[in-house]
Amino acid sequence: MIYLKILEKLNQAIWLFDINKRVLIWGNQSCKKYKNIESITSLFNNSNLINDIRNGKSKHEHIDIIESNENGEILKQMIFKYSSIHISDMDARQLYLDTSINLLVNQDSHYLDYEGKRIFILVEAIEEIKFIQSPLSSSIENHNINNNQNNQNSVNINSSNKGQYNRPEPSNMGSWEWNVQNDTTKASNQFYKIIGIENDFNKKLNFNDFINKLGIQEIQPIINNCIESNSSSFEYPLRINRKNDNLVRYIQLKGEIIKKDDKVFKVLGVCHDFSEIQEAKDKLEEESKFVEALIGCLKAGIVACNSNGDLTHFNKSAQDLHGLELNDKTDRKQLLDQILKCYRSPYEQINLEKSGTPIIRALSGEFINDQEIIITPTSNQQQSSLSKSNRPRSQSNCSNGNKSQNRLSKNYSTTTTTTNNNNNNNNNNNNNNNNNNNNNSISQQQQTQVSTQQTQQQQNTTNGIGGATTSTTAAAATITSPQQIPIATKIPTKINDNEFLVLASGQEIVSKDGKTIGAFVALHDITERKRNEVILKNATEEAQRANQLKGEFLANISHELLSPMNSIIGMVGLCLDVAPRNLKEMLNDVVESSKILLDLLHQILDFTTLESNSLAVRPFPFKLRDTFNQLFKVFYTRIIEKKISLTFSIDPNIADDFYGDQNRLKQILSNLIDNAIKFSNSSNINNSISIIVEQLTHNQFKKYKDSFRSNSKTHSRLNSHDDYSIDGDYDDQDNNDSYFGRDINVSDNESAVGGFSELDEKDNSDDDDENDDENDETDENDDDTDDDTSSNTSRNNISNNLLFHNNTSGGGGGGINKREKFKKKDREGFVNLKFSIKDRGIGVPEDKHDFIFDRFFQVDGSYSRVQGGVGLGLSICKKLIEFFGGAIWFESEASQGSTFHFILSIKSVEAPSPKSPSLQSSNGSINSTTKLFESSRLKNEIYIPSLPNVQTKKVKKDSNDNGNNDSTNYGISLSNSMNNININGSTLNNNNSINNNNNSNDNGPLTSRTPSNSYYNFIASLNNTSLKSSSHNTLSSSPTGFNGISNLNISGLNNLSNLSNNPNNLNNIIGNTNGNNNTNGNNNSGISLNNSNNNIQTPNGLNNSRGSSLISTPSTKNVKKQHSCPMDLIQRIHSICTPRGPISKECGLNNLPAYSPPKSPGRSLSHGGKNYSNLISTPRGGVGYSSPPINSSSSSGGGSSTNGSNSGNSSANNSTPSSSSLSSTPLTSSNTPSPVSISSNNVNNNNQQQQTQPILSPILPLKDNSIDISDLNNINSLTPNSSNSTSTNVTQSSSNIINNGNSITIINNNPVTPNGKKIVIVPLLSLQSASSPKQSQRGYSPKQQYSPKQYSPKQQYSPKQYSPKQQQQQQQQQQQLEQLSGRMSPHKSNLSSTNLHHIHHHHIHQQQSQQHNNTTVHSNNLILNNNNNNNNNNNNNNNNNNNNNNNNNNNNNNTTNTSNNHTSDPSKSSNSTPETSPPISSPRSNNNNNCSLTTIVGVTTPPQPSSTITTPQFQSPPILSGNSGNINLLSSNGTSSGGIEISGSQMIPQKVLVAEDNTMNQKLIKTLLTKRGFDITIAKDGKQALDFYHESKNKSILYDCILMDIQMPILSGLEATCAIREIEANEGGHIPIIAVTAHAMKGDKEKFLESGVDDYVTKPINPKLLYEVINTQICKYIEENRSSSTINENKNTINNNNNNTNNNNNNNNSSNPVNNNNSNSIDATQQELNNEKIRI
């Protein structure tokens, strides 16, 4: 207590404050001059200040305090320092008991009952800052002058006047005095400074002069009014301009009138300069306006009130929420009551009590944070002060409330509240001192309905400080917080349409002295958000249910999908064992397609399994190198195809025996190797794949895993919100380590991550192997018993045993020491492996790196992408690796290749694992289960079978094993150079270097380990292996089973005719290259297999000439839509092709897309391996065709070769002009009719040998008697069959005919058999189009056909060009045709059946046209084929040479055959009859048409050396169907046929371009359309389709229809379609394009039709629907293009040829082709025919 005595005598004011009771208990003598000590106590209501002081921190605070002195009371601003002190209990008692201590509290307080330390706060006045109020204000304000005290007051004032003006005054305060009796004025020096003038003390001024000098004349009337009103004081504010500097100053004049003897004696006054205060007020008012505007603009509703319950702020958003309005006339207190009635709980249907409303809770000191409440707007409330607002919520720049009423800017003193316990209505009488020093008594009644606590009442303590009585009051009106609503346990109620769900946030507003001056609440409308959350929640739940159902569906459907696929593959495999050779190819295609589908199903099911956390791990012992052996066996053929050099390197220190799920490891490696092969570039000379397996230390493994571990979800472009991560223990445990998981179905406390599985706790102690004991000697003795039982326990508990491991602790229990020991031993029992697969493929662009592991992501996802797939492979790999506790990453650069790395920790076992049943077979076939690549004694050596040019490579690598001196790492190298392999027949005949000696030297481990005949067995058996389909067509197209051999050119081998019958004979010819494992490695057998299609060139002279058609004539007026080609597509086409021709002006370019002339489509006839001994049946209503090979004959002057362009296969083959071609492959499938071809030497005018093209000849189906050409080895068997037979079968190729010595004799240019049987001869008339420039922009319109006036008499055929001998030959030919055709009389016609003709339009390639010069193309003479001598008779129609009118059925056939002459002399045709009708232009040809007649025999005949072939090759035969005169593409049985019926009996094959990249689909579509007689051309991508289209336009042989696949490499189907439509828009015409695609989702059809296609057929293809669509589209454009003008012209042509009608068959074979001018009228049949034609 001694220091208290010392503090009491200090001049500084010091107080002592009890921190626990929060009362001021003591003060020294210096503090007695300060009156408002309650302002000090109010600071201790701040809990933060109390805590800081309690913790020993010193605080400095600014406090406004009133000081009482002899001059009165002065309001000062002081700085007080707060610090904590500790007082013992004894001192505290002495403090409270000592009456001499200046205690500020009552001593009867029970402070002695407090337990613990006494902590007091010492408050020390540090510094006085400045005066706040004038020293006279308080005295004037509180001084009352009564008439009874005038004398005494007068004396006091007189006694104090002496030193009044000499004492110092504040700088902003001045005083003045007016002696009324003497009329003199005095003022202080500070007063003059405020006014801005100098004080003249010597000069006496009266009052008028004084106020005039100062410029305050306004004060005089105020004083006069005050005197007259008997008032004692006055106050008046002034705004003046200071005299010396003209500054605006705000002053306030205050005065007091002193009377003496009821007379005014003096007027005392002060002048207060409050300019700084006024400026602060102005600034505050500006800020207040800014705040008002800001609050009004907020979207959230703001509700604020002061401590008296008056509403201060209510912005526009809040008004809309509550349905109320605030204006100047609104009673704010009543408005607040209305606001409180709008709230209700979101969990109940009743309104909140006022105590629970946010504004009341905030006013009571509670912090409101996002409380959900429902606001029900006030309705039907018509009051003068309140109005309902139903306007929509909007932001408004408005300032709310009365501007003059700013409650927040005032200082309120503490309110004394009297609480009535029986009533909640409290009357609060507050005495407040405002800044204007007005005595205002504010009586406020605050109505509340809240449950309140009784507030503490501060006792008024009378203290002797300056003799004054201090009334200390403490405000204590505290409102208790309402009960908290347990939101989590309640269910939200429904929100009505007229209600709002809001989030309320608010708090109280506290003044500087700690008083609560108000509160505010912000209301955020979340109604829409909540509704959207409900919708989203329902949608999420629905999606989760759908996802669950999807997973269950896929899990259940897996059996239903895999079972039929297994049946399909199995049954087809059984069929392969017994099927004939011609069906095996198609069955193999079925197997390959089924396996592709099966692989896709497995991928989808695996991904679904990983997604649904139902992955089952099936561990078993396996050998690592055997795993790679099996993978190399699967991918070997594809490696050969893509010409990849594969290098496999494995660390020799890595053991071979492991325990885990081998199938999952193979799945990961298979996906990565498959991608490396798929995206490799075969044209790259450095095309290679490198596979490296390394062993990592634990630290390296951990470093890789921490660096590349996926810590977040993969990027997803469209489904980023989906989380498909495995629910495993992926969190960081023990430095991001965790054990590899067991089966997913284990319990949750056992971590399902890590290598493959984790041991149970009971297995933890049993898993100590020998390596563990060696590395941990301290545990050796303790674990001997466990080691003895470890093998049995770990083997029996396979599902719970460790497979792959991640070097961390897993789940389970057990002690700490045992667990630490388990972790150490597990790390030692696992091997950390790093796998790297490096390729030199296309790489991954940098911007796609983040998405490469996303599901369904593809680097190129466009329709024109080269590689297929669904984009699940890498995603499955990533999920599997992460599921097993590993990590995967990659390094890639565009066009430089990619390297994929992944790490796994795999359980290593010492004991040799038992052999899998799948590895016990010893069969050497690749189809067996024997390892393809045998492992040597060294674990790191793996070998492959010996193949030509396949080398083994040593990969040297520094070994990381300590103490291991073997630094050589032997790896395998699969160097695929099959592109250099070629089989050369001449080499086989002349080079007898094939050595079967068993004593040859080995040239390496590859040769030594290859079994006998392994080369053939290996290659031939690849057809049956489960390999994925390659993008190349060569492997699947080889009929001999030699996948990879696409071309067999055997030029000098005469004894290979039986090779096709027995493919195994090729081994006898080639020889045993291995020689029972002792074959000389340096032996060169001269055998090479060419697997490259890039170097194949079409020989000179082989042209793919196409016939014309009357279909798909381009029409300008029928093109309804203009398909504009996008600029990016044009740029792509320009980058692919070379410029040629003009382009549409709409595109802004001057050149058409590039169309380099493609190679003639088709497959070579010299495709060795099979003979033509298969039966080909003719479809109903059609003509059977066979495609015999071109035989080599020693008697012929030169061999012949074919172009092999049948069915539009795009791969051509090499052939030499002087070599014979062995034809052994059918041009069509086994169930498809193949055209019969006859080839002979083609000699031009210069007697130069040229290669010829096969001629496809139709075999005429006879309606009554048909010739069964079933065995050409015995021609005597050619006898007519029964009348019901409609098919002709060709059972043997012409090569066998020659070998067996059979021959066909040509009698009168007609073939007959040795026994005199005649062969059916069908004359084939074709229109040849000369190449000529376009006549107009749209040169394909039917209106541009030649009229009869355009033909001169010289262009007509003259009878003189046929000699009598030739006419006689023609008559004999017609007679033979009659005998063979039997009763082939046409319906509704009296004409002879021998007059049937079949029209076929064709075109000769420009190159062939140049070779023939004026013989075929530029000549209008009749060209006769002396070899074939065929007259094609269709329904008794005799075609005149120049009258090629489709509607003229009665024209005489005035053609004769010239022997040994190929062209007619133009001079001999001068006597032609001018009345003949002109030929009709073909819609697929240009305007300059030349007519030629070619006869094609129905069976094969020996080649004639002296004949010249001028007829081009036809891909498919014409079809005979029906006799209707209408255009019809349906045969008599209602099925679609590939020809158009003309003149009731003539059919023209339709040319169809098929754009398809899939080989299997190419074969299917080709077979389907060829069966119906369509002429097919196959394009393997969009660019080639565009090339073929452009080539057809250049040759004026347009396609009738295009079947366009959508997704194709280089150019997609949509891009090719857009380019074709752009060309048509520029040049005219329109060709039907039918989309044939597997894209069958909603919207695909509309998108395709919008791009320019005419129709749409989905895959799998429905043949009936495909025929119907083709028929509809072709007929549609035929009807549009064949305008009425053409029909009228044909009608006139028929009328002009009425005189040429011949009713007798004798006129058909007339020797002189003269016009018969018979006067007979057209018979009834002709009239009916004309009527039918007119109806078209």
From Swiss-Prot:
Bias-annotated ranges (Low complexity): 143-161, 379-389, 413-469, 790-807, 961-971, 1080-1096, 1186-1195, 1202-1258, 1340-1376, 1425-1475, 1482-1492, 1506-1520, 1695-1722
Residue ranges of domain Histidine kinase in the record: 556-908
SMART domains the UniProt entry points to:
HATPase_c, HisKA, REC
In which residue ranges is the amino acid composition biased (Acidic residues)? Answer: 725-735, 758-789
SUPFAM superfamilies tied to this protein: ATPase domain of HSP90 chaperone/DNA topoisomerase II/histidine kinase, CheY-like, Homodimeric domain of signal transducing histidine kinase, PYP-like sensor domain (PAS domain)
Q: What does this protein do?
A: Acts as a receptor histidine kinase for a signal transduction pathway. This protein undergoes an ATP-dependent autophosphorylation at a conserved histidine residue in the kinase core, and a phosphoryl group is then transferred to a conserved aspartate residue in the receiver domain.
Q: What is this protein called?
A: Hybrid signal transduction histidine kinase I
Task: Tell me what organism the protein belongs to.
Answer: Dictyostelium discoideum (Social amoeba)
Q: Which gene encodes it?
A: dhkI-1
